């Protein structure tokens, strides 16, 4: 799932830091997701990211 997030970052020329600041999702949460300490973000955070990038929540689950 994090790979999908990385693809969106690259496609939109964003950093995780920028996304954190823009969405209010703590950078520590994104870092833990990247490292694998968090396997899946909560539905609330996935919804925020999906809206931010203009994709469906399902995009992250494919």
State the predicted function of each range.
Residues 25-40:
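Recognition helix of helix-turn-helix/homeodomain-like DNA-binding domains
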Residues 18, 29, 59:
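Residues in the helix-turn-helix
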Residues 44-59:
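DNA major-groove recognition helix of helix-turn-helix/homeodomain DNA-binding modules
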Residues 1-15:
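A short, Lys/Arg-rich alpha-helix, primarily the initiator
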Residues 9, 20, 50:
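The alpha-helix within a helix-turn-helix
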Residues 13, 40-43:
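Residue at a beta-strand N-cap/secondary-structure junction
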Residues 7, 21, 32, 62:
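DNA-binding alpha-helical recognition surfaces that contact promoter or target DNA
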């Amino acid at each position: 799932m994090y790979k999908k997030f990385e693809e969106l970052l690259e496609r939109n020329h964003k950093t995780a830091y920028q996304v954190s600041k823009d969405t209010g999702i703590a950078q520590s949460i994104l870092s833990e997701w990247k490292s694998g300490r968090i396997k899946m973000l909560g539905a609330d955070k996935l919804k925020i990211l999906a809206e931010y990038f203009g994709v469906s929540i399902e995009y992250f689950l494919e």
